Structures are given as structure tokens and as C-alpha cells.
């Protein structure tokens, strides 16, 4: 009986360790810290400025993360101090995300990147209209006047060479 409990506990620990936690948070903060000049890495105000500048160009999940921490003008609340101060102390981004931000707003660590589509096997005709619109949205494109599924598929096929990198 105790072996069974131990085995189940081990499986749960391994499964939770395999799933990346706070992946969007870590990536955004890593990108931001790479942009911060070496002389400003210990200044919370300078880090905050770089975060806000970086967040102006983000889309999708990264933009949602920026909204949650208050780095966007339209954000309702701001927890930027919970981000900038620990980063100025050289705290690792993973620790900032898991220990500081997750406690303030659990939604931050629930953000996950969408799995990339396998363009070699995907059948656009079998996808729902909402999924097709999401593909265009991820690319930052819109299909004005598209009311039919076939029109969305046509637009995706037109833009596919621009956004989908074919592997050799």
C-alpha cells in the first residue's frame, strides 16, 4: 500500500515538473532584462520603463501578461513594483514569476503559449470559424468582410507564405 502511495506521489511530482510554469511571464521578463542596459539593471525605474516600452509591441499572451502586471495604459491595476524591485536586486525571472507575481495574481502563471500548428497535416476546412479567426489574430491580420468560412480559409492560404516557415 505504501509503495502505491509513493509511486502515485512520484508520478504527480514528475508530471508537475515536466509542465512549464509561468512560461509567458518568464519569457517576457527575460526579453525585458536582455534589453535593459548593464548600468540600469539595478534601477527599478529604468527596468519599469523598459518593460512598458517592450509591452507596447507585444501581442496575444504576452500582451495579456503586460495587462495583468499593469504595464499597459489600459491596465486597471499595477503590480509593477512587484516586478521591477526584485529584478533590480538580480532576482532570477523564474523566481519573480513563481514567488512574487503568482501570489499576487494567479492568472499570470496560468498564461501558456498556444501549441504551434502542424501546417503539413492541418486541414483548415475541418477547423471552426473561431479557430480560423484566431490564426489570423495571432498573425496580427484581419479579414474584413469575411463572412464565410471559405473566405477565411482563402485569406489564411494567401498569408501562409508570409507567416509559416516551411522546414527543410
UniProtKB/Swiss-Prot annotation:
Magnesium among keywords: no
Signal peptide per UniProt: 1-17
Impact after mutating residue 75 to L: In dma1; results in up-regulation of ER stress response protein hsp-4 in the intestine and pharyngeal epithelium. Elevated expression of hsp-4 is suppressed in xbp-1 or ire-1 RNAi-mediated knockdown animals
Induction: By endoplasmic reticulum stress.
Annotated keywords: Disulfide bond, Endoplasmic reticulum, Lipid-binding, Secreted, Signal, Stress response
Tissues showing expression: Expressed in the intestine, spermatheca and nervous system. Expressed in the hypoderm. Expressed in structures of the excretory system. Not expressed in the male gonad.
Localization terms from the record: Secreted; Endoplasmic reticulum lumen
Disulfide bonds listed in the record: 22-109, 25-97, 55-66, 143-146
Pfam family membership, one: ARMET_C
Domain of life, per lineage: Eukaryota
GO MF annotations, alphabetized: sulfatide binding
Sequence similarity: Belongs to the ARMET family.
This protein's name: Mesencephalic astrocyte-derived neurotrophic factor homolog
Amino acid at each position: 500500500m505504501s509503495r502505491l502511495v509513493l509511486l502515485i506521489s512520484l508520478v504527480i511530482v514528475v508530471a508537475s515538473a515536466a509542465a512549464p510554469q509561468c512560461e509567458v511571464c518568464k519569457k517576457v521578463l527575460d526579453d525585458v532584462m536582455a534589453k535593459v542596459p548593464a548600468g540600469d539593471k539595478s534601477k527599478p525605474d529604468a527596468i519599469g520603463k523598459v518593460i512598458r516600452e517592450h509591452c507596447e509591441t507585444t501581442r496575444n499572451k504576452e500582451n495579456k501578461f503586460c495587462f495583468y502586471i499593469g504595464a499597459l495604459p489600459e491596465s486597471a491595476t499595477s503590480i509593477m513594483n512587484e516586478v521591477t524591485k526584485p529584478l533590480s536586486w538580480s532576482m532570477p525571472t523564474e523566481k519573480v514569476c513563481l514567488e512574487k507575481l503568482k501570489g499576487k495574481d494567479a492568472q499570470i502563471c496560468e498564461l501558456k503559449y498556444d501549441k504551434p500548428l502542424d501546417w503539413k497535416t492541418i486541414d483548415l476546412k475541418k477547423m471552426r470559424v473561431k479557430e480560423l479567426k484566431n490564426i489570423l489574430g495571432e498573425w496580427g491580420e484581419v479579414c474584413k468582410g469575411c463572412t464565410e468560412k471559405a473566405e477565411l480559409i482563402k485569406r489564411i492560404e494567401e498569408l501562409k507564405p508570409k507567416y509559416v516557415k516551411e522546414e527543410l
